[in-house]
């Protein structure tokens, strides 16, 4: 991973574990979130989309974040803050959001480190994210 102030490089080996931890755990990026970030396929579930969005934050992929954010709630600039390094994702709960659902909620905790012009800071984001299907595709609607 790159240092602060620059984008993290994408893992290049096909057997690199996905930054989301893999689903199932330990799955390689190429078999987990990689195809979603590349636009090769859509997420089957709300959890898969949430994991791919976390991976996009880790890898600095603002295009994926923008593409998977509901147009009614997204900002004009979806680029991740390159001063923040995301270190770990824990999925705490999933409500609906399956292949046959129209809505879903994924609760997660994501740990981060930042060196924002000062001493190293650590923190975590704890969120219950809402997802909906739009034109058959899962999109992030916002936090509850």
Each model region followed by its residue ranges:
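Surface-exposed, charged secondary-structure patches
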Residues: 81-124
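Cysteine-rich micro-motifs
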Residues: 28-36
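Short Cys/His-rich zinc-binding micro-motifs
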Residues: 3, 14-27
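Beta-strand-connecting loop/turn residues
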Residues: 16, 102, 136-137
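Short beta-strand edge/turn micro-motifs at domain boundaries
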Residues: 123-144
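Small disulfide-bonded, cysteine-rich extracellular recognition modules and tandem repeats
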Residues: 21-23, 35, 134
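Intrinsically disordered, low-complexity linkers and tails
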Residues: 1-10, 98, 130
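Core segments of small alpha/beta cavity-forming domains
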Residues: 35-82
